[in-house]
């Protein structure tokens, strides 16, 4: 998937609906942060982005959303030996 195709709310909403994911406000906000560019990131890095953008989203919601996006194929994971899991938007 080319994340650059999903750089606005309407495209992201379509992407979520296409994967049978209810596009809640929090999921859309998280998806906008994730799919704005091709990137690799950890959950902790995403949580920092959420905080930096002053979004009212809990850590639990971030982790649950990452698991949902992974299970539906929107994200791939890269497990490293040092117990970090990186998420990939490609």
Give the positions of each predicted feature.
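Basic amphipathic alpha-helical segments that dock to polyanions
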Residues: 62-72
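A short acidic, leucine-rich amphipathic alpha-helix
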Residues: 45-51
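Pre-recognition alpha-helix immediately N-terminal to the DNA-recognition helix
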Residues: 28-33
């Amino acid at each position: 998937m080319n994340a650059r195709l999903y750089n606005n709310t309407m495209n992201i909403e379509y992407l979520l609906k296409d994967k049978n994911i209810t596009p809640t406000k929090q999921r859309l906000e998280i998806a906008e942060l994730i799919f704005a560019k091709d990137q690799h990131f950890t959950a902790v890095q995403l949580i920092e982005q959420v905080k930096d953008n002053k979004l009212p989203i809990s850590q639990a919601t971030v982790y649950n959303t990452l698991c949902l996006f992974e299970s539906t194929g929107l994200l791939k994971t890269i497990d490293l030996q040092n117990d970090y899991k990186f998420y990939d938007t490609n």
